Amino acid sequence: MARIQGVDLPNDKRVEIGLTAIYGIGRQSSNKILAKLGINPDTRVKDLTESELSDIRNELDNYLTEGDLRRDVAMNIKRLKEINCYRGSRHKKGLPVRGQHTKNNARTRKGPRKQA
């Protein structure tokens, strides 16, 4: 099993899909990386050579992934809460942030119904 950025990539999947197991790398980023390195996206992870894996590791160093990205997102939300903007207050209250109505729905953000 190939280990990149502290994540074990699934051996039986195509490289294009396997790279999406890394937080912050989606299909588009994965395809862009593979095209730049000249690696066939249909290759299975288990068939990658050690040199190809090291090339992928070096290319991923240019991307914000895993812990760094999670920390960055958390710091952005924390900053919104600290400056007491509307979005920050919605984060604090656990309500939808992007303008959705909450009269009937938003159960995911609001949690289970509270009995009166």
From Swiss-Prot:
<dbReference type="GO" id="GO:0000049">
    <property type="term" value="F:tRNA binding"/>
</dbReference>
<comment type="function">
    <text>Located at the top of the head of the 30S subunit, it contacts several helices of the 16S rRNA. In the 70S ribosome it contacts the 23S rRNA (bridge B1a) and protein L5 of the 50S subunit (bridge B1b), connecting the 2 subunits; these bridges are implicated in subunit movement. Contacts the tRNAs in the A and P-sites.</text>
</comment>
<keyword id="KW-0689">Ribosomal protein</keyword>
<keyword id="KW-0694">RNA-binding</keyword>
<dbReference type="GO" id="GO:0006412">
    <property type="term" value="P:translation"/>
</dbReference>
<keyword id="KW-0820">tRNA-binding</keyword>
<dbReference type="InterPro" id="IPR001892">
    <property type="entry name" value="Ribosomal_uS13"/>
</dbReference>
<feature type="region of interest" description="Disordered">
    <location>
        <begin position="88"/>
        <end position="116"/>
    </location>
</feature>
<dbReference type="InterPro" id="IPR018269">
    <property type="entry name" value="Ribosomal_uS13_CS"/>
</dbReference>
<dbReference type="GO" id="GO:0005829">
    <property type="term" value="C:cytosol"/>
</dbReference>
<dbReference type="GO" id="GO:0003735">
    <property type="term" value="F:structural constituent of ribosome"/>
</dbReference>
<protein>
    <recommendedName>
        <fullName>Small ribosomal subunit protein uS13</fullName>
    </recommendedName>
</protein>
<dbReference type="InterPro" id="IPR027437">
    <property type="entry name" value="Rbsml_uS13_C"/>
</dbReference>
<dbReference type="InterPro" id="IPR019980">
    <property type="entry name" value="Ribosomal_uS13_bac-type"/>
</dbReference>
<keyword id="KW-0699">rRNA-binding</keyword>
<dbReference type="Pfam" id="PF00416">
    <property type="entry name" value="Ribosomal_S13"/>
</dbReference>
<keyword id="KW-0687">Ribonucleoprotein</keyword>
<dbReference type="GO" id="GO:0019843">
    <property type="term" value="F:rRNA binding"/>
</dbReference>
<comment type="subunit">
    <text>Part of the 30S ribosomal subunit. Forms a loose heterodimer with protein S19. Forms two bridges to the 50S subunit in the 70S ribosome.</text>
</comment>
<dbReference type="GO" id="GO:0015935">
    <property type="term" value="C:small ribosomal subunit"/>
</dbReference>
<comment type="similarity">
    <text>Belongs to the universal ribosomal protein uS13 family.</text>
</comment>
<dbReference type="InterPro" id="IPR010979">
    <property type="entry name" value="Ribosomal_uS13-like_H2TH"/>
</dbReference>
